[in-house]
Structure formats: structure tokens, C-alpha cells
Amino acid sequence: MFYCSKCNAPLQIDHSLQDANTGQLNLLTQNKQSVSAAAPKLNSVDFIPKERLELLEEVEKNGHNEPIHFLDTIEEHGTDSSPDHDSSPDASLVVNGGEIEEPVPVSAPSPESSEADGPNPISGRIHTLEKIFDILSNKGEVNHPMCDECAELLIENYKLKFDQNQREKDSYMTFLKKLKLKDDSDIKESDLDTKLRDSIQECRDLAASEQEKLQELRSLEQNREELSKELQDVKMELALQQSTELSNALRLKNELHWTLQRKADQLAQEKARYRVVLNRLDHLRNLNMYTKFFDIAADDQFGKINGFRLGYKVPWSEVNCALGQVVLLAVFLCKRLDVRLQSYKLVPMGSRSQIVKLSSDHDKSKTVLNLYSSNELSLGKLFNFNKLDVSMIALLDVLSQIEATVLALDSEIELPYTISPKKDVIGGKSIRVTSNSDWTFSCKFLLVNFKWILTYASSRH
């Protein structure tokens, strides 16, 4: 059983190979070396063996001008050989295009052939077919055997390559025609000679200029050496004078220079201190204490106040700290904007802050709403909602009252996210903790609105 070298599909060998006799298969396998050895030679005479040439000379001398017919010693499958031809199994002679091939002797059966005709002919034939496929694979770039589908794909690939090469050849031919049709005046020999002479003259001028510059450089080098020598003499003379009559004057000069340098350094230090103080003063003047105390930021996921995040899947310790900062910010804004809260009192106590909900004037009862949680659920009137839901709704109501005060002070201000305390919604998202991901967005919207009000309060003061 043979398999395709490309897709590994089982193959059915063609009947031309299945029905081939031992002599035909031996001819295919034995001619491999002779063909490969003769390929690199260029002389056609070298391709003909010496015995064939001698046979040709002998035939020409004997005057045999009759055509030589091909004697087929290979049996066809399902047909008998013709009685008109010599059926000798010893040799065959072929005349093709004026080239005479020597009789091909039928060699003694090899071990493989005898094994094929013997008790196990299938294994010998398979071994011979493997040799034939190896010869075909070594001669080309494609491995054999190959199924019909892979062969058709290979042929299509070669056709595409041929078409591509044909188009490339046409492009080159078109470009060559354009070059031939180009105006000959652009490439006249006289113009080339003129440009060549100009280039040679320019090269000579550059060489002459180079020599002039080199001469000038040598002159400058000589002057430099002379000046260096003079400088050395002056230095020696100056050293001699310093060692005698100018030593005291130079010492006094150095002392005065040192004193001046020290005073200049002190002046530079004082100027630097003055600039630092001025910069610090300008920084303090431009410092916004509101945003410094309450740093509110928001990214794609969470809102933050002073580095503490608010939202779903945030640790409760961090959420409690953030809510405490929000309560402190609300108290600060109420004092700055003179907001009088209705029915609420804010109690900032860090991560355990509270909102006290006051009843009507006649009833002095109050309800303490803890603005912190440990994720413990309470069963009762709130339909298993978290205790923090009521506190968050109260905080949203406080923000709504602060917004109303700001709008009363300046009607042109509009917060980015709409507040609906009756529906427990800000910016279209529920403020309830149990809303999970919506609570994250609503907390971020809450902080953004607080940041806008804080900016407005800082601009008023």
C-alpha cells in the first residue's frame, strides 16, 4: 500500500505500473545512474556509448540502409505478441530520430526480480516501485507518489507561477520598448562626453583646491608651533617675575579675589533663598485647599476620594473609609455654602460615620443610619436589602439638598449627573449597594457631582 506524499491518502497504483513486467521495471531502475552522469556533459557524442558508435560504424560499412524496426520484447497485458516480429528475449534495437541505440541485453534476473517471480512477487514489485518513486523524487522538487488531487493542485500552482512569470516578462518587454522609444537626444554621446569632461575638470579643480588647503594647513600648523614656543617663553618669564618682585602683589590680589568670591557666593545664596520663598508664597496663593483636602478622581472603573475607592468588589474597609471622607466633605460643603439640611444630621467619624435621620418637629425621635458595613445582611422590612442601602439613599438625599442650595445661588450651574432621591437613582444608576455593578457607577457619579460642587465652593471663596 502506497500513500500520497502530500496528504497521506492511500493510493491505487496505475495499471501501467501494476501490469509492467520485470524487464520494464529493471530498465527504469537501472538507467538512473547513466542518465544522471550524462546530464552535465555538453557534447552530444559523449552521450552515446563507445559500443554503439562502433556498431554504427559497422552498419555503415556493411551498407545496411534498410530501416531498423523496433523489436518489442515486453508483453502487453491481455494481448499476444505479433507473430511477424522476432520475439527473441535477448535484445531490442531502437532507431529514433537518426539516433541508434544499442541492443539492451536482458540481464540475468536479480535477487529482487527473482524474488518478484518467486514465491512472493508482491514484495519484490513493491520494492521496485519504491525505487522508481525515489528516482522520480530525486530528479524533481516534488516527492512521489502523489494522488490525483495533489497532482492537480501542483499543476495549478505551476500554471500560476508560469502566468506570473509571463506577466513579469511582459512588463520587462514593455519597459524595454519604452527605453527604446525614448528621445535619443537625452543620451547623445556628445552630451556624455561634455559631462565627462566637466566632471574631470571639476575633479582637477577639487584636487588643486585640496592642495591649497593642505598648504594653508601646514602654514597654520607652523604658526601654532611658533606661538606655542612664544607662550612657553612668556610663561617662564612670568614665573620668574612672580618668584621675585610680583609675589606680594599677586598674594594681595588672591586675597581680594577670594573675599569678593565669598561675598558673591553669599549674595547668590540669599537670592536663591529669596526665590524659593517667593515660589512657595506663589504656590500657597494658588493652592486650592478645597481640592487639596478632598482629592476626588474617577477612572473607567471606580471613583476615588483621597485614594479610597468606592464600588462593587472593593474591600469593605476601604469602602467605609471612602464613605467617611464623603460625609466629611458633605459637612464641609454645608458649612461653606450655608446649607441647612432638612431631616438629616451628618456625623463624620472616619470609617464609622453616621447619618442621623430626624423625624418631624412634634416627634423628636431619630434614626441613626450607619454609613458603613461589614457585608452582613438583615432580614426585615427592607426585603433582605443591606443596611447600607438606606444610608446610601439618605446620602443621596443630602447631596440633592446641597445641589438645590447651589442652584439657588447660581441658576446657571448644572451638575453632570441627574439626581433622583425618590427613585434612589443618580445618572440612571441605582445607589443601592445590592445593585452590584450599578452601585459602582452610581458611587462614581456621586463623587463627580460632589467634585463639581466643591469646585464651585472654592471659586466663591
Curated annotation (Swiss-Prot):
The keyword Ribonucleoprotein does not apply. GO terms for biological process: autophagosome assembly; cellular response to nitrogen starvation; late endosome to vacuole transport; mitophagy. Pfam families: APG6, APG6_N. GO terms for cellular component: phagophore assembly site; phosphatidylinositol 3-kinase complex, class III, type I; phosphatidylinositol 3-kinase complex, class III, type II. Keywords: Coiled coil. Residues 75-94, 101-124 are annotated as: Disordered. Belongs to the beclin family. This is Autophagy-related protein 6.
